[in-house]
Each structure stands twice: as C-alpha cells, then as structure tokens.
C-alpha cells in the first residue's frame, strides 16, 4: 500500500502524463535522443545485451532508447497513466519492453537481477530516497552499475529563482501544459521531501552509508 505522499505524487504525474509523453516523444525524434544515448552508452559496462532496469521510467524515454540499442529493458513507475504513455511509445516502435507498475522504494525483483539500474529525474520526487537507493543496489548484479541522472531541483524552489521563468509552449524540451496550479503543487511536494536539501552532498552522505 502506498503512502499518502506517494498518492499525491502519483496524482500530480497523472495530470501531467499526456503532455509529458509528448515532450519525451519529441526528444526521441530529434537530436536530444541521440545525445542521451551517447551519454548513457559511454557509462555502460562493456557488454552486449545488458539487462537494464529503468526506475521511474515515466513515459519510457530511457527504456525505448536502450531497447532500440539492443538491450533487454524493463521499466517501472508508480503512475499507471505514465506507463500507458510508455507502452504506446514502445508499441509505435515495435519494441518488446516490459513495463510494470511498481514502487521504486520497494522493488519486487530478486537480488542481483540486473546489470544496470538507471533513473532520470526520479530521486528528487521520492519520500524515502535512501530506501530506494538500497533497493537499487540490492537488485544489481555483482559489478553492476547504477546510473542516476538527477539534480538539485529543490534549489529553484528554495530560491524562487524560477518564479518568473517562462518556457515557450512549443519548446521541444519545455514543460508543456505546466499550469500555475501544477507548478505550485510541484513546489509544495518538493519542499516536503527529505531530499529537498543541498545535492549532490545529500546523496553522497547516503551512498556512503549503504
């Protein structure tokens, strides 16, 4: 059973799922997708056909990129509406990707199941990110790699530096459909999180404990 905060987060991303899917589809179809693939492949173990877990897959951007590159990918997310967008994206490209509704903080996989666990823009949304980190390491095979692409997004909320920043509605990488109400909800959720502290210093302290 998910917590009240997780329900709030899931509701927020449900409201954004369709527009978010449009942004990620746009990225897959332009140079951004190839830039991301090159960056990820530079960090991957030197092995073909890796078994990869995309945690917080959202609309399946990383999962699709890596499946197209020949890897065996599974994507998980807490938000069913996001997963529907991901399945649609994969089906449009005839890709066989397993997408599951799952809590990133309580994985249902056995230990040492994956060569790589990767995530993008997820840890800052988690109520218990330290628990999530422990789970991700648990399902990694010996010598496996954890790739976490994230940022100190709470810094913008703390400083209000983004208050007057407007993104053009047709921007391919912008937050299409991001209303003032959704922005306020995003800010309020962010400030309640343990991870709403200075990063990556917070992450480094946690990772040293694991």
List where the protein language model places each region.
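Short alpha-helix
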Residues: 177, 182-183, 194-210
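A short acidic, Gly/Pro-enriched loop at the edge of an enzyme's catalytic core
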Residues: 105-116
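Class I SAM-dependent methyltransferase SAM/SAH-binding core
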Residues: 51-55, 59-106
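Conserved class I S-adenosyl-L-methionine
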Residues: 1-48, 61-62, 145-181
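A short SAM/SAH-binding and catalytic strip from SAM-dependent methyltransferases
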Residues: 116-129
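A short glycine-rich, Lys/Arg-flanked "PGG" loop and its adjoining helix->strand segment in the class I
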Residues: 130-145
